């Protein structure tokens, strides 16, 4: 389809090679195979990698490693992650900080440039990451700063989500918490934001 062709072109422009999932993409030049939670163990590429003795790592482990090498802001929460991740990335870009981006949703401005949209390699050591909670792997991340937007039942129960998000804040050097969400009230934070009086930063301050 046209959409698939466009995505392929954008990925190739980003430097990604596209291969059929039949194991043919695993060759002597392959160093490591990275998979997401959605990839089953029976996948032909995984079988080829294991047969060749190549390491197979989860996407979250690769991302955790990247996060450690950068000055990273991780955005988490049940909803609004992609939007706030994009906002922070655009703010830093406007301030000429040349950040990198790893997000779940594509940014329109980047797509208009023919890029894939949800990943961008900037010229500085700043990185803005959308930290997805759906498979629980965000607890592997140790960012410089984390932003927790909200908690509501979605991929997991609220109690389990609270543990995941709080763990992320405890592994962060600095954290910002939505003071309007009572489910986050017990979280320790460096700064709070929201509309209510409990928030350290509110829209009417700007």
Model-identified regions with their sequence ranges:
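Thr-Gly-centered strand-to-loop micro-motif
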Residues: 1, 35-36
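NAD(P)-binding Rossmann-fold cofactor-contacting core
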Residues: 1-10, 99
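Phosphate-binding loop of NTP-binding sites
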Residues: 13, 20, 25-30, 37-191, ...
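Short acidic/polar mixed-charge low-complexity motifs
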Residues: 125, 197-199
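Active-site glycine/GP-rich loop and adjacent strand/helix microenvironment
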Residues: 196, 205-206
């Amino acid at each position: 389809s046209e959409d698939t062709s466009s995505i392929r072109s954008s990925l190739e422009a980003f430097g990604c090679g596209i291969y059929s999932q039949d194991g043919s993409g695993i060759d002597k030049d392959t160093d490591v195979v990275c998979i997401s939670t959605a990839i089953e163990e029976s996948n032909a590429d995984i079988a080829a990698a294991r047969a060749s003795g190549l390491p197979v790592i989860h996407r979250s482990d690769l991302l955790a490693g990247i996060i450690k090498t950068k000055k990273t802001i991780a955005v988490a929460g049940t909803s609004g992650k992609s939007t706030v991740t994009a906002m922070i990335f655009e703010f830093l870009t406007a301030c000429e900080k040349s950040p990198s981006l790893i997000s779940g949703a594509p940014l329109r401005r980047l797509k208009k440039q023919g890029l894939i949209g949800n990943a961008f390699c900037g010229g500085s050591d700043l990185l803005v990451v959308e930290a997805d909670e759906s498979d629980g792997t965000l607890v592997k991340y140790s960012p410089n700063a984390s932003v927790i937007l909200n908690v509501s039942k979605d991929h997991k129960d609220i109690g389990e989500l609270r543990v995941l998000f709080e763990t992320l804040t405890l592994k962060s050097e600095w954290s910002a918490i939505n003071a309007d969400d009572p489910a986050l009230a017990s979280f320790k934070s460096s700064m709070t934001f929201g509309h209510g009086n409990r928030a350290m930063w509110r829209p009417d301050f700007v």
